[in-house]
Structures are given as C-alpha cells and as structure tokens.
Amino acid sequence: MAFGAHAFIWSGEWNLKEAEKVIRGASDAGLDFVEIPLLRPRDLDISGTKALLEEHGLNCTCSLGLPREAHLPAAPGKAEVFLKTAVDVAAELGSPVLCGVLYAHIGTLTGKPPTEEEFKKITRVLKSVAHYAEKKGISLGIEAVNRYETYLINLASQLGDILDRIAEPNVFAHLDTYHMNIEEKGFYEPIVSLGKRLRYIHLSESDRGIPGTGNVHWDDVFRGLREIDYRGDLVMESFAAVNEDLAGATAIWRSLVESPEVLVRDGLTFLRTKATEHNAYSNREDN
C-alpha cells in the first residue's frame, strides 16, 4: 500500500502555481502520491501537472464530486459525459483510480430517501463509465459520505449494495473516517464488512482537522485494515485551504488547522505511528 494526501491540505485551487506548492509539499513530507481533485477536469493543465509530478518523483490519484448540473440521478447523461472526461484526464495524469462521490453533486438533497429509480440510474451510468475506464486502465472508487452532503450513499452497507448492482471488477469501495464518524456505529465492523472490496480510504479527523486530535477511533480503524489485510492506499484528508466549489457543500467556514505544515507534520506522524502499531502498513513494492 502507499501513503498519500489530498491536495486540499495545501491549496484549495489547482493551477500550475498552486500545483507546484501542493506537489512540493507532498514530496517534502515523504509521501508516495498526492490526490488531485478533478472538480473541473477540462481546466486542468495535464502536461504541466505531469511535469511537476515527475520532477518531484510523486505518483497521483484523482477524485471528484459531480458538478451541480450533473447530479447523476437528475442528469445521468451529463454525469456520464463528465465522468468519462475525468477518466480521460486521470489516465493522462497516470492515476490508476478515479474515486470520490462519482454518483452525486455534494450538497444536493431532495428532502426524501433515495429511490429505486435513482439507484438504477446510478448503476447504469457507473457501469458504462466502468467499461470505458477499464479500457484506459482506470478503476473507479465509490465513496460513502454523510447525510448532510448526500441522501444517496452514507454507509458501508450501502456501498456494498451498489457494488453488487454494478458488479464490475474495476469498481471498488472508498471509505472516509470523517463520514464514518457521523454515519456508522463504529469503525472496525464497516471496514471488515467490505473486506477486499475496500481499496481506498481517506484518513480524516472528526472535525477534518489534524488526525489524532478528535473523536475518530483510530485503533479500530487500523485494526480493521489489518484484519482485511488492506493493500489499498492510505490518504490523509483535511482542508487547510477552502475550495470555492466545495466550501458550501462541505460546510467549511473557517480554517481547520494552524497551517498545512503543522497538519502534515503532526497528522502524518500520528497516522504512520498508528499504522505501524497495528502492522497495517506496507510499502508499495510489497503489494
């Protein structure tokens, strides 16, 4: 497995100036990769980003949430086009995955529980995108997020259900400890219930601040990862910088940490220590 961090730890934007800051920060922290948000995939400077990654010896992964106008249940055609564009960009960047809230615009709520028709649309579109992504060597990670950000998939059990519906080998589960702290009754059981279908996890504190300073039960998290012999990526996620596309949807109204440097220093030290304590971390080459 590899250890990485989300770009929003360093910057809420992605242009070449900000990308250089993000990639340099991740490299200085000794990370294996950086997670690049593809909220506006058509605007990303692919060649410039690739050059920066190569210069600093870093790999990348890619993630996204759908734009408001492409909320999948309401606009499946627009969602499919957007996702396939993001797959193209991820492939050109050299990312092996595209993960996140691939099925919804974060913050779009209907005031009602999800319907069977909505899940049929999600299944149909993500199955099509999975076939497209497979030809480009990309796997899709579906993330469960909390009830205030989506009404569709909040729990590991719901992730399992949608994976059963899509039934494609390059589609997997993506968990996030911040969302789990809100929705799940614990951390160990949801991780173990997904087993090998869990291939990506955001390690995020209960307030999205520095890991180890909040309410997440980290021993249970890493005990669960060890139980399933987790071989996916470990990704520290926080928001030292606010992105204008996500600030409202994620309700981030203030700085969550003193600085990116403090977050990376203290957060990564804590997470690496916990992973080592539970023997839940191995190097990429051990996969």
Question: What kind of region is each of these model predictions?
Answer:
Residues 3, 60, 140:
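Hydrophobic anchor at the start of a short beta-strand
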Residues 29, 56, 136, 228:
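Conserved dinucleotide-binding and phosphotransfer motif residues
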Residues 45-57, 125-133, 190, 220-225:
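Catalytic-core regions built around general acid/base machinery
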